[in-house]
Regions:
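A generic signature of intrinsically disordered, low-complexity regions enriched in glycine/proline
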Residues: 24, 40, 68, 76, ...
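Core domains of carbohydrate- and sulfate-ester-processing enzymes
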Residues: 38-87
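Short, compositionally biased strand/turn segments
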Residues: 24-25, 47
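Accessory beta-strand-rich segments of carbohydrate-active enzymes
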Residues: 2-20, 33-35, 48-54, 80-126
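Short glycine/threonine/proline-enriched tight-turn/helix- or strand-capping micro-motif at secondary-structure
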Residues: 25-30, 73-77
């Protein structure tokens, strides 16, 4: 991770400095509700992000953000705070094999850190 200031260097721990962007916090976050590996997909990792002044879906994204870290966190790679009049968009292409689901099972997308309002698009449909 790129460090932007001498103060920011103090915020990193040994673990933060050595984080693997392709393998970020892959364990299931609630040990008492642990899922089988074939029924759980962790969405942590690199996503595209965009800050916008409009609630319209952006055409272009500003760059990459490392999830699960918030944009303000140095480990996110963004180091920017969302302003009150802005919207924050994330985008990532994820492929799931729906055929793996049994007839009586459900497909659930869980976001553990949505603070306000969230709109989810699947195959471009809200």
């Amino acid at each position: 991770m790129k460090q932007n200031s001498r103060f920011e260097k103090k915020l990193y721990t040994t673990w933060g400095r050595n984080i693997d962007k392709n393998n970020v916090l892959t364990e299931y976050p609630r040990p008492l509700l642990k899922r089988d590996a074939d029924s759980y997909v962790n969405l942590n990792g690199i996503w595209k992000y965009a800050f916008t002044a409009s609630n319209k879906r952006p055409v272009r994204f500003d760059g990459d953000i490392l999830v699960p870290f918030s944009p303000e966190a140095p480990l996110s790679g963004v180091n920017r705070q969302l302003k009150p009049n802005e919207y924050l968009w994330y985008e990532r292409i994820v492929t799931f094999d729906i055929n793996r689901l049994s007839d009586n099972s459900r497909f659930i997308i869980h976001f553990g850190a949505v603070d306000q309002i969230c709109s989810v698009y699947v195959n471009g449909i809200k």
